[in-house]
Each structure stands twice: as structure tokens, then as C-alpha cells.
């Protein structure tokens, strides 16, 4: 079974013996630097200096759909969460962290904002690091007026991102007033507190949020600029009379 993105066709596959809904496509080995590299490589449509170089997975000397392979896994190696509680005199603090390690994300937004081909729309400043003869170590293929080499029309490993993250899911800090102060407002006890959710996310993923919701029963980790989890802060007071 294969699941599809909206522009690049099939991006995931489910089969016996493999992770559920793993990412499937062409494996990018790098960028062709010169004509000699093109000539030495397997036959590949659109091959030229500045274009992606794909892996000849089956070794038949021709790059085509038969060379699609596993390029990522949206399933994490492990999930974790832990609570921490502290108190000192009248102060108390509790927090909950959770995270995901080892999962990949297919960044579908890159198909639009990072494409080396311009179609009368805005692009990310990241494409300024596009390949030129004087910039051979570029991250992106050479800029072009057309999409070449199936670079941004077929699923490939260029769009796979590390989706690992650690998130401060909740934090509460409280201060219990001394009884002498609480009694002045006619209370037996009073506690002021701050409560926050989704305050901090530690991740290498550059999108809005690495915690990507499932896009289908067999399409996980497909990032299309979904709105991130919101951060919420509140103040409160608990009073007992």
C-alpha cells in the first residue's frame, strides 16, 4: 500500500517486514559537480552539473522508479515523558517534559518554498544557497526556470527531516502565602500560581512544530505547514476560607 502527498505522488509505503508507512522515494547522493561526474554515473534523465544525483539502487545502470527505496521512517525509536517536582520553603514547582526520538518528517512545504524553480511565487531565503560553479558545496540544486531531474516532483530523501524533539509540556510555579498574610484577607491559606503549557520545544526541525499530526491511516509525519500547538500561560490563586 502506498500513501501520497499532494504534489509528489507516492511518498510512503507499507509492506511486510518494514516499518509501518515508511517514507519511500529516490535516495539523493548529492549534487553533480561537473560533466565527468554525470558521465561516470548511471543513466539519469536531466542529469547535469548542479542537479541531484540519485542512487542506482538496483544497479542496472539506469535511474528510474525501480530505484525508489526506503528514505525515512516516521515511527520514533522511542517516546518518553517525565515529571519533575520541587519545593523550597513556600515555593513549589512542577513540570512535565515529553518527547520523541528517531522519527523522520517529510517536509512537504519545501516543495513550494525551497524549490529551485520559480513559478511567480515567493521562495525561502534558503535557496540563496543554491549550487553554482563557485558554490559547489551548496545545499540546494542550481536555480532553474523549470523543475528538472524530478527533483521537486518526485519523493526523494532531500525532503526528509529529523523530527526528534523534547518539549516542556507543562509548567506550574506556585507560592503559598504565609498564614499571617492569608489571614489578613480572611483566608486560612492562599497560594498564587503561574501555569503554562507548550512553553519550550527543543528540536532541529525548522518547521512550525515537529509534533506533526497523522495525515491519514497510513501517512505519518507528513508536514504541510500545519498550525503548531499553541502556548498558553495563565495566572491564578487558590484560596481556602
Regions found by a protein language model. Give the residues of each.
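Conserved small-residue
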Residues: 1-74, 204
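C-terminal beta-signal and terminal closure region of outer-membrane beta-barrel proteins
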Residues: 6-36, 128-130, 134-138, 203-241
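Extracytoplasmic gating/loop element in the C-terminal half of outer-membrane beta-barrel translocons
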Residues: 18-22, 35, 46-47, 100-191, ...
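Outer-envelope beta-barrel architecture signal
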Residues: 78, 89-91, 164, 186-190, ...
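Membrane-embedded beta-strand positions in outer-membrane beta-barrel channels/transporters
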Residues: 81-83, 170-174, 234-236
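Outer-membrane beta-barrel pore domains and translocons
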Residues: 87, 98-100, 195-199, 240
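Repeated loop/turn-to-beta-strand initiation elements of outer-membrane beta-barrel proteins
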Residues: 90-95, 180-181
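Membrane-embedded beta-strand positions of outer-membrane beta-barrel proteins
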Residues: 95, 192-194, 237
Amino acid at each position: 500500500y502506498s500513501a501520497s502527498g499532494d504534489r509528489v505522488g507516492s511518498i510512503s509505503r507499507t509492506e511486510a517486514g518494514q516499518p509501518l508507512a515508511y517514507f519511500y522515494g529516490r535516495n539523493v547522493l548529492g549534487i553533480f559537480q561537473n560533466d565527468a561526474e554525470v558521465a561516470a554515473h548511471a543513466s539519469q534523465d536531466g542529469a547535469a552539473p548542479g542537479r541531484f544525483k540519485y542512487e542506482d539502487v538496483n544497479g542496472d545502470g539506469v535511474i528510474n522508479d525501480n530505484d525508489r527505496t526506503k528514505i525515512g521512517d516516521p515511527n520514533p525509536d522511542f517516546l518518553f515523558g517525565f515529571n519533575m517536582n520541587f519545593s523550597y520553603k513556600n515555593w513549589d514547582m512542577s513540570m512535565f517534559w515529553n518527547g520523541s526520538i528517531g522519527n523522520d518528517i517529510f517536509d512537504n512545504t519545501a516543495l513550494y518554498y525551497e524549490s529551485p524553480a520559480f513559478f511567480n511565487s515567493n521562495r525561502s531565503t534558503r535557496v540563496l544557497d543554491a549550487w553554482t560553479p563557485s558554490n559547489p558545496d551548496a545545499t540546494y540544486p542550481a536555480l532553474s526556470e523549470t523543475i528538472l531531474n524530478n527533483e521537486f516532483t518526485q519523493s526523494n530523501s532531500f525532503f526528509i527531516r529529523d523530527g526528534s524533539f523534547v518539549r516542556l509540556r507543562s509548567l506550574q510555579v506556585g507560592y503559598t502565602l504565609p498564614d499571617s498574610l492569608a489571614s489578613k484577607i480572611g483566608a486560612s491559606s492562599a497560594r498564587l500560581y503561574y501555569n503554562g503549557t507548550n512553553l519550550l520545544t527543543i528540536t532541529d526541525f525548522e518547521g512550525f512544530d515537529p509534533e506533526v499530526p497523522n495525515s491519514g491511516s497510513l501517512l505519518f509525519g507528513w508536514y504541510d505547514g500545519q498550525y503548531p500547538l499553541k502556548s498558553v500561560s495563565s495566572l491564578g490563586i487558590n484560596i481556602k476560607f
